Curated annotation (Swiss-Prot):
<feature type="modified residue" description="Phosphoserine">
    <location>
        <position position="557"/>
    </location>
</feature>
<feature type="compositionally biased region" description="Low complexity">
    <location>
        <begin position="90"/>
        <end position="105"/>
    </location>
</feature>
<feature type="domain" description="Rhodanese">
    <location>
        <begin position="425"/>
        <end position="532"/>
    </location>
</feature>
<feature type="modified residue" description="Phosphoserine; by MELK and MAPK14">
    <location>
        <position position="319"/>
    </location>
</feature>
<dbReference type="GO" id="GO:0051301">
    <property type="term" value="P:cell division"/>
</dbReference>
<dbReference type="InterPro" id="IPR036873">
    <property type="entry name" value="Rhodanese-like_dom_sf"/>
</dbReference>
<feature type="modified residue" description="Phosphoserine">
    <location>
        <position position="42"/>
    </location>
</feature>
<keyword id="KW-0963">Cytoplasm</keyword>
<dbReference type="GO" id="GO:0004721">
    <property type="term" value="F:phosphoprotein phosphatase activity"/>
</dbReference>
<dbReference type="GO" id="GO:0001556">
    <property type="term" value="P:oocyte maturation"/>
</dbReference>
<feature type="active site">
    <location>
        <position position="481"/>
    </location>
</feature>
<feature type="region of interest" description="Disordered">
    <location>
        <begin position="31"/>
        <end position="51"/>
    </location>
</feature>
<dbReference type="Pfam" id="PF00581">
    <property type="entry name" value="Rhodanese"/>
</dbReference>
<keyword id="KW-0904">Protein phosphatase</keyword>
<feature type="modified residue" description="Phosphoserine; by AURKA">
    <location>
        <position position="349"/>
    </location>
</feature>
<feature type="region of interest" description="Disordered">
    <location>
        <begin position="339"/>
        <end position="359"/>
    </location>
</feature>
<keyword id="KW-0206">Cytoskeleton</keyword>
Length: 574
């Protein structure tokens, strides 16, 4: 049935000349040009174009008007894909309509027939479609903000971030598939107004409870330290500070009124459904993620670990605690699920823990120690202050001399000894004059014995040693020569060497011996009264050169014989 076309005034807002399906668009819409005589410009242009070309251009402009608005470009990528699918479906319908219009034009039908739809109804339907598209853009922006908030809350834990991303991707794919399934059944629905269907909103109390549960469950991930030292050193105050700074705590601290003020439009309920899916995570996996890295042992457990390897105890670090050392057996207890007697083996070594705990600690054996006070005092004391047998200290006052291993006395001490000041302690003293005979005859100290050669001194002192009648008194030997620099010290060392060889260590015949400092040359000028004759004859006297030569030869020959004899004795001992 054909309806006669309605003529519109030139200044009206709508033109019904060339509109498909009765949908009219207002003139005040931006981005779409209207002519003075219709939808696409002047009547001259409409007359020059064929009806099929005019219809194709009209449908193309109608499809582009709703798909490329500035607000649509701000929307998400998925929404653009949906609008692209709609435009493609519209273009498909345009092609089909163009083919039908060509057939109708061939049959003599006019495509400029008026639409049966009322112009006001068409304008209202068009405005509703535009408003629905703007609401879709706003809701998608809110969804993007919610996903960004969830990613920031899960930023402290990579595991939580992966779980949240995977769940969000699954839910988004499900929504996308449902939308495509709903929009695919028929192509005739493209002319209907696209109205965004709001999701069913659950009660507000359930969303608040879900947010609180989500915040408490994710608290373990956000507060988990990144390393074991941070975990051990983290205090209660530090944990409170981290909780206050976390975005999850800030979001959960909002009051119900503040949350009600925020227009969630049901998208928080989607997040609640994702949280319910997290309940399917096994308890063991949740413990692995949220449990502390280091386990603290109780005192009872530390006491139970008693059996350790001795080698590990010996070579372990001193700062390492004993509880860290591995036990001898890898498994302290036998498995209870094996009751077959064939599989059970007898332990080769080791005692039960109860018997080992009852054992008393063994007494440690220390190094033996001598309790002899005298020997300890002798060994601990300085040997240089004791006489040869280490039994007593030196009686006479000593002075520093040329040889540090020998004891020197001054001429004044010699005079005190000659005058008998030490008679109560000294039973007998012997003054050994080591000079040559012509020197001794020229002048010597009273009661001195001339022993120029070592064999003579050995025969006189060691073949028939002098022994004290009273054990509390001492026997003292005093050696000197012209200067007490060479012959006197050499004779003193010789007598000590022979005395050591003749007695068991540390016993000696003559443990106390001295050297007269300065010799006879220094003693005679100071105390000539204790010399007889009171004269001094030097060793290199011109009248006694031959005697000096002879005694030197004897001394050297005897020294050579002694060295040869000692060498032969050493060879025989080997």
């Amino acid at each position: 049935m054909e309806v006669p076309p309605q003529k519109s005034a030139p200044g009206s807002a709508l033109s019904t000349a060339r509109v498909l399906g009765g949908i009219q668009r207002p003139r005040h819409l931006s981005g779409f040009g209207f002519g003075s005589d219709g939808l696409l410009g002047s009547p001259e242009r409409a007359a020059s174009s064929s009806p099929v070309t005019t219809l194709t251009q009209t449908m193309y402009n109608l499809a582009g008007l709703g798909s490329e608005t500035p607000k649509t470009q701000v929307g998400s990528l998925s929404f653009q894909n949906r609008l692209t699918d709609l435009s493609l479906s519209r273009r498909t319908s345009e092609c089909s309509l163009s083919s039908e219009s060509s057939e109708s034009s061939d049959a003599g039908l006019c495509m400029d027939s008026p639409s049966p739809m009322d112009p006001q109804t068409a304008e209202r339907t068009f405005e509703q479609a535009i408003q629905a598209a703007s609401r879709v853009i706003q809701k998608m922006q809110f969804t993007i903000k919610a996903s960004v908030f969830a990613s920031e809350a899960a930023g402290h834990s990579p595991v939580l971030q992966n779980i949240t991303n995977s769940q969000a991707l699954d839910s988004w794919e499900k929504d996308e598939a449902g939308y495509r399934a709903a929009s695919s059944p028929g192509e005739d629905k493209e002319n209907d107004g696209y109205i965004f269907k709001m999701p069913q909103k659950l009660p507000h109390s359930s969303s608040a409870r879900a947010l609180a549960e989500w915040a408490s469950r994710r608290e373990a991930f956000t507060q988990r330290p990144s390393s074991a030292p941070d975990l051990m050193c983290l205090t209660t105050d530090g944990k409170m500070d981290v909780e206050e700074a976390s975005p999850v705590a800030q979001s959960s601290s909002l009051t119900p009124v503040e949350r009600a003020c925020e227009e969630d439009d049901g998208f928080v309920d989607i997040l609640e459904s994702d949280l319910k899916d997290d309940d399917m995570v096994p308890a063991g996996m949740e413990n692995l993620i949220s449990a502390p890295l280091v386990k603290k042992l109780d005192k009872e457990e530390e006491q139970d670990l008693i059996m350790f390897s001795k080698c590990q105890r010996l070579f372990r670090s001193p700062s390492m605690p004993c509880s860290v050392i591995r036990p001898i057996l890898k498994r302290l207890e036998r498995p209870h699920d094996r009751d077959v007697p064939v599989l059970s083996k007898r332990r080769k070594s080791g005692t039960p823990l109860e018997e080992q705990q009852l054992e008393e600690p063994k007494a440690r054996v220390f190094r033996s120690k001598s309790l002899c006070h005298e020997i300890e005092s002798i060994l601990d004391s300085d040997h240089r202050g004791l006489i040869g047998d280490y039994s007593k200290a030196f009686l006479l006052q000593t002075v520093d001399g040329k040889h540090q291993d020998l004891k020197y006395i001054s001429p004044e001490t010699m005079v005190a000894l000659l005058t008998g000041k030490f008679s109560n302690i000294v039973e007998k003293f012997v003054i050994v004059d080591c000079r040559y005979p012509y020197e001794y005859e020229g002048g010597h100290i009273k009661n001195a014995v001339n022993l120029p050669l070592e064999p003579d001194a050995e025969t006189f002192l060691l073949k028939h040693p002098i022994t004290p009648c009273n054990l509390d008194k001492r026997i003292i030997l005093i050696f000197h020569c012209e200067f007490s620099s060479e012959r006197g010290p050499r004779m003193c060392r010789f007598i000590r060497e022979r005395d050591r060889a003749a007695n068991d260590y540390p016993s000696l015949y003559y443990p106390e011996m001295y050297i007269l400092k300065g010799g006879y040359k220094e003693f005679f000028p100071q105390h000539p009264n204790f010399c007889e004759p009171q004269d001094y004859r030097p060793m290199n006297h011109a009248a006694f050169r031959d005697e000096l030569r002879n005694f030197r030869l004897k001394t050297r020959s005897w020294a050579g014989e002694r060295s040869t004899t000692q060498l032969c004795s050493r060879l025989q001992d080997q």
